[in-house]
Amino acid sequence: MNPHLLTHETADDYVRGMARVTQLVAQHLAADAPSTGATVADLTPAVEGVDLDRPAADLDAALAEVTDIYLRDAIWFHHPSYVAHLNCPVALPAVLAEGIIAAVNTSVDTWDQSAGGTLVEQRLIRWTAGRIGFGEGADGVFTSGGTQSNLQGLLLARGEAVRRAGSDATLRVLATEHSHFSVIKAARIMGLHPSAVIAVPTDETGGMSTAALAAELDGIRERGETAMAVVATAGTTDLGVIDPISTIADLAAAHGTWLHVDAAYGGGLLTSLRRRHLLDGIERADSVTVDFHKTFFQPVSSSAIVVRDGATLGHVTHHADYLNPRTAVTPNQVDKSLQTTRRFDALKLWLTLRVTGADAVGEMFDEVIDRAHQVREVLRDDERFEVAVEPVLSTVLLRYRPKGVGVTEADSLNPRIRHALLDDGSVMVAGTTIDGRAWLKFTLLNPQTSLAHLRGIIETIATTGEALRAEDELDELRVTAGSRGSGADALAPRPTMAGVTR
């Protein structure tokens, strides 16, 4: 017997080990903050001090080590005071599915490796396509995330554009400055010139200006170039804005241009009973990105690229005699995917739909969108804060700017507030820059984050900002006193901020 491998002979060890691991994680789920505030400098010595050439004494010793180097200081996305990035608490059935996925270790690249897994993935793709509004000819494949899904969508767009135009010399991709950066990365990977991605101006809502898009498409045609793709975003990362998909679809169709909808964030609306209309027009897309590991509450990774015409997936097909020969009777998933070996991530979504249900998933997303609108109303009555735009999804951009704080000072102060909160660890918010101005960002994906939690976070931000301003004023007094020769003892000791470091 080999004691190191999972077999029927080590099944008892497997059960005991999994019990130990689940108990360990369960203990940490009760963390009283989303972060410990540990820094790279704090964690590096422990990680570098591990001798990877010498194994630990046993599983318990190895797990204690994992606790020291990772688990104790992990960032807990399920904590209600985590409102930073597009990270969600995960559905319990999906976590349980992860255990099955890892133990069986299926690879869903070819039929002979994954008969049942292939059928499950294909069924989920058809289900997602139906929710989008695609017809019987739709198809797709699970991917590692929105970046890969967007890359594949644009690869297919290029394949179609080259098929029609006969050349890739003057291909152009139209997106906005708020589109995900993976659009530009995809263009680079495909070897397109940096000028190939055209930033279409946005309107006052932050969404793509359809008048500007029409002008850009006309200009491309007049210059003899080829509009390879228009990328509409259903939920921008910074603003949570949904581009006007229906009108964009009209323009793309009029110019014979591939329409890719990046619904990595907003795709959760496909299960919403109250807000599905926000995705109207998505059924006219040629390809759609959906990140289940965002608004379907799935563990990373779980995403998909879904296309209206499955035949277009042929642009990424390559046959290998040892794996997926042209003579194969049954199509293999590798024929559609950029990856070869690929985890059976679809099982997580399957088990979630079978236990939790699609309606409940949609309601959880609706709840966090509700919360974004509620916190917007709180901020509307709070003169200490500004809000960038009205929320559409679950993102709220705010910044601390009380009376007496100028625009430039606010641009400096708000990133400092964020870093102070990050150092403390009790609250985690994100930050970004819009039109050259610094903003804090609430990205709400946890239904357990109540309005009371958010009111508390707002007060923590304000208190931290006040303390930082007090420090700045004291620094100025010290500089002034020093320039007058008052000596080091001219002022009282500097006050400290509870839970805030610089």
Task: Go through each PLM region and give its residues.
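PLP-dependent enzyme catalytic core of the Aspartate aminotransferase-like
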Residues: 434-502
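Short loop-beta-helix segment that forms the pyridoxal 5′-phosphate
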Residues: 128-152, 198-201
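Active-site C-terminal subdomain of aminotransferase-like
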Residues: 280-383
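Conserved PLP-enzyme active-site core in the AAT-like
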Residues: 149-311
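N-terminal entrance/gating region of PLP-dependent enzymes' catalytic architecture
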Residues: 2-137, 422, 427, 449, ...
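Conserved PLP-binding catalytic core of the aspartate aminotransferase-like
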Residues: 386-421
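Short beta-strand
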Residues: 37, 386-391, 429-433
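Conserved PLP-binding active-site segment of the aspartate aminotransferase-like
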Residues: 353, 397-407, 426-456
